[in-house]
């Protein structure tokens, strides 16, 4: 039912309203982190089914050119969603999207570039046509977990370090990153 509603909305925006800017669609935010809490009943299998359903509904409406982005997960550390998206949804998800909040010191040591290069390498091993993006990227220093705010974004260095992290990310072969928290 949810996939039908989403596909109807995308169809309305593209066909009725003439929006040509919709090229990709992300179904959910940090779903892997939600699934890590067993109390909510969410899982990889449920998300996978929703992605397959969405692809089917978009295709039924002639929206085959709208790419699905995923898994839109939190940092991949021990997370299996990255691998499962590459292997189980290979033909359905052409854009691999994750979120990452780094410590500013990681830019000094090129840790950002090293880790994103590794992430890109594993993506390329599976499918060289896939694209990697950071759907959210920012600096963790000063993050208030309770209020979910970046308390240091007004410091002169915040934007500088985000820009440095973005440059390292692009050097490693990634296609894009969205700076998150620059306007908190």
Regions found by a protein language model. Give the residues of each.
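Active-site cleft segment of glycoside hydrolase catalytic domains centered on the general acid/base Glu
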Residues: 1-93, 98-118, 144-162
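Internal nucleotide-binding/catalytic subdomain
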Residues: 121-124, 128-130
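Aromatic/acidic polysaccharide-binding cleft in carbohydrate-active enzymes
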Residues: 134-184
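Structural recognition of the beta-strand scaffold that forms the well-ordered cores
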Residues: 23-27, 67-70, 94-98, 130-136, ...
């Amino acid at each position: 039912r949810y996939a039908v509603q989403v596909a109807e909305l995308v169809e309305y925006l593209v066909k009725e309203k003439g929006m040509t800017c919709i090229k990709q669609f992300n179904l959910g935010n940090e779903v892997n982190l939600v699934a890590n809490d067993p109390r909510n009943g969410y899982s990889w299998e449920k998300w996978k089914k929703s992605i397959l359903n969405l692809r089917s509904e978009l295709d039924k409406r002639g929206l085959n050119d709208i790419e699905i982005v995923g898994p839109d997960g939190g940092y991949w550390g021990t997370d299996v969603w990255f691998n499962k998206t590459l292997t189980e949804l290979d033909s359905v998800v052409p854009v691999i999207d994750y979120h990452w909040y780094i410590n500013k010191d990681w830019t000094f040591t090129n840790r950002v570039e090293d880790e994103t290069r590794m992430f890109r390498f594993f993506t390329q091993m599976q499918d060289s046509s896939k694209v990697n993006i950071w759907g959210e990227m920012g600096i963790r220093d000063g993050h208030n977990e309770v209020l979910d705010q970046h308390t240091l974004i007004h410091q002169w260095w915040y934007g500088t370090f985000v820009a440095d992290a973005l440059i390292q990310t692009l050097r490693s072969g990634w296609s894009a990153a969205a700076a998150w928290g620059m306007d908190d």
